[in-house]
């Protein structure tokens, strides 16, 4: 089965690379928002219909790739008074934001609109951050636009401001949204499984989701699974959200609960969350093409976080009036307990099941300032990137069963800047240490760099971005069974999931050129990329680094919201001169995501030693 899957993936990669190469049939001017159908639109339509039929997704409603431009869109209206707010909600089918009054002629569309439960107007009213008479703030407008889109109950939206013809100092706000279908019976053939389930959006006309799925998995040791979740966002206009996820399969059984409020705008004063989970994990699946790693643990975790933000209006920069500076104080409690486990730690330290808890307080200086970009970490979809300087100081008490109580303190700083006509870079540094019996333990310095270039056009059909990522970590005063390590999940060579690189210091760099298509092929957006990953580790006073691993390869990323593919990544990696008994010198990696699962809000918050300005654009500032 796995060999057949690999052959299919490789064939698909070669086919899609061929499709993305500039072809003579694509000589006309290309619109990146439309499918290129070449000289045979009927044949292309047949292919598209076959794809939709094979995917069993022709009854499923999907979001559109609406491009959000951020605060820049509203800059021309800065300082003007809001005169009125007009809101209109559209049915899911037969109309669009651009043509809201088009007659619905198809019987299927009329039937679907008839059984759809429309979103109640108060859902949008609860998201509007300005009131009539307020002054337009472009940053607040951008925050509101992003918040509405992130609710994931609309397939499309558009927010515009219009100056009154008789008073140029006053504007009207127009908000148009188009609902996603409020319910779907969903069939999906995915990379890891085939699933069927029911998906409820706009449940009871409110911003609620309730999803349940049964999956047939493509592996004998995990033949079937069941998962689902419930979510209610912005309860009673409080911006507090509740989330419950549950999962049952041969590897992982359990549930998790989250209730919290994020920093949802530049004017937010407080946030926080409560998180708890309970899981029984029999094995860990690093890559679905590889064998699962046995774990056999039962654990529960809790996290409680509460920050308070104070505005610093006296700090202003003329070049960027949208930025807002904050002084933040916060407190966080983490706890992780294993109720059953085979051992505390493996000999190679690749797996550890150590009980612990911590309480930390922090103060920080943060900047609420971000911009919108497309085609960076995801295809087409709008992403947000921070700008400016953030810093924080943390201190508190940590307890781990192997070492007992220790004090912990850390300094964190980040700086990000968008260089005009060149690109974007973000630097992050953190120094932290434990203290016990007046002696420092497990001191670690972490530094990281992210850079991506501006778009460089190659003709009318292809554009290019260059990515560079680098990490350097240095540790001191480690216990005998503890050290730093690098793998796929913490900045090492992609596809190397084992802790083959361990030591007092580690370094890694990744260089990745990406080539994107400006057109779509039967609904697919795509890019191809190459990469070179180099990682090394060292200990002692001899060679600074005494072990090196290299990885080189090619990959493909595609996106097709109509087929339910939010993100598909196929990567082939080769590791020259790698002589490891437990690791092949090549790997095939597949990542696939869609909007099926409501999502794990807190993820691995319970093992974090820092407090994040959670869910805010300042996502890398530990506060």
Question: Model regions: which residues?
Answer:
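Bacterial N-terminal signal peptides
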Residues: 10-21
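Beta-rich carbohydrate-recognition modules and glycan-binding surfaces
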Residues: 7, 22, 27
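N-terminal secretory signal peptides that target proteins for export/translocation
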Residues: 1-7
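Immediate N-terminus of the mature polypeptide
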Residues: 2, 26-440, 451-623
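Generic recognition of cysteine residues
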Residues: 8-10, 395
């Amino acid at each position: 089965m796995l060999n057949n899957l690999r052959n299919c993936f490789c064939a698909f990669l070669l086919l899609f690379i061929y499709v993305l190469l500039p072809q003579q049939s694509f000589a006309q001017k290309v619109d990146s928002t439309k499918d290129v159908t070449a000289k045979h639109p009927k044949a292309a339509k047949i292919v598209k219909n076959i794809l939709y039929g094979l995917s069993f997704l022709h009854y499923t409603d999907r979001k559109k790739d609406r491009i959000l431009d951020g605060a820049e869109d509203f800059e021309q209206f800065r300082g003007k008074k809001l005169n009125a707010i007009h809101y209109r909600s559209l049915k899911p089918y037969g109309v669009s934001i651009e043509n809201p009054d088009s007659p619905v002629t198809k019987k299927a569309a009329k039937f679907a609109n008839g059984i759809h439960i429309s979103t109640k107007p108060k859902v949008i009213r609860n998201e509007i951050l300005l009131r009539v008479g307020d002054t337009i703030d472009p940053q607040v407008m951008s925050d509101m636009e992003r918040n509405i889109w992130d609710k994931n109950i609309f397939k499309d939206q558009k927010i515009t401001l219009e100056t009154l013809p008789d008073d140029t100092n006053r504007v009207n706000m127009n908000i148009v949204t188009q609902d996603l279908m409020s319910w779907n019976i969903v069939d999906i053939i995915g990379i890891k499984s085939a699933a069927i389930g029911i998906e409820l959006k706009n449940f009871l006309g409110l911003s609620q989701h309730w999803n349940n799925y049964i999956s047939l998995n493509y592996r004998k040791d995990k033949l079937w699974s069941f998962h689902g979740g419930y979510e209610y966002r912005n309860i009673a206009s409080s911006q507090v959200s509740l989330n419950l996820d549950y999962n049952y399969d041969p590897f992982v059984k359990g549930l998790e609960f989250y209730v919290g409020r994020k920093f949802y705008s530049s004017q937010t004063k407080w946030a926080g969350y409560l998180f708890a989970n309970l899981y029984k994990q029999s094995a860990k699946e690093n890559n679905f093409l590889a064998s699962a790693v046995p774990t056999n643990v039962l654990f529960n975790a809790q996290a409680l976080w509460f920050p308070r933000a104070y505005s610093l209006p006296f700090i202003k920069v003329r070049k960027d009036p949208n930025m807002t500076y904050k002084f933040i104080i916060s407190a966080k409690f983490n706890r992780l307990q294993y109720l059953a486990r085979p051992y505390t730690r493996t000999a190679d330290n690749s797996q550890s099941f150590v009980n612990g808890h911590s309480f930390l307080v922090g103060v920080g200086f943060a900047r609420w300032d971000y911009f919108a970009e497309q085609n960076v970490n995801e295809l087409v979809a709008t992403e947000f990137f921070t700008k400016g300087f953030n810093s924080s100081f943390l201190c508190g008490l940590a307890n781990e069963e192997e070492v007992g109580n220790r004090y912990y303190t850390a300094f964190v700083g980040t700086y990000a800047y968008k260089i005009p006509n060149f690109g974007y870079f973000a630097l992050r540094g953190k120094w932290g240490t434990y203290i016990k019996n007046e002696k420092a333990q497990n001191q670690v310095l972490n530094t990281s760099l992210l850079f991506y270039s501006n778009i460089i056009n190659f003709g009318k059909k292809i554009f290019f971005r260059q990515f560079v990522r680098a990490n350097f970590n240095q540790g001191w005063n480690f216990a005998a069974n503890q050290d730093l390590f690098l793998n796929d999940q913490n900045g090492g060579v992609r596809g190397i999931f084992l802790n083959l690189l361990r030591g007092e210091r580690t370094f890694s760099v990744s260089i990745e050129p990406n080539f994107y298509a400006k057109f779509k092929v039967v609904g697919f957006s795509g890019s191809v990329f190459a990469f070179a990953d180099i990682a090394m580790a060292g200990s002692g006073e001899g060679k600074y680094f005494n072990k090196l691993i290299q990885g080189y390869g090619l990959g493909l990323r595609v996106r097709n919201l109509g087929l339910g593919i939010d993100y598909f990544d196929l990567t082939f990696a080769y590791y020259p001169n790698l002589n490891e008994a437990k690791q092949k010198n090549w790997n095939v990696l597949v990542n696939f995501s869609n909007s099926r699962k409501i999502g794990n809000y807190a993820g691995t918050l319970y093992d974090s030693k820092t407090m994040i300005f959670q869910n805010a654009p300042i996502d890398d500032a530990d506060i």
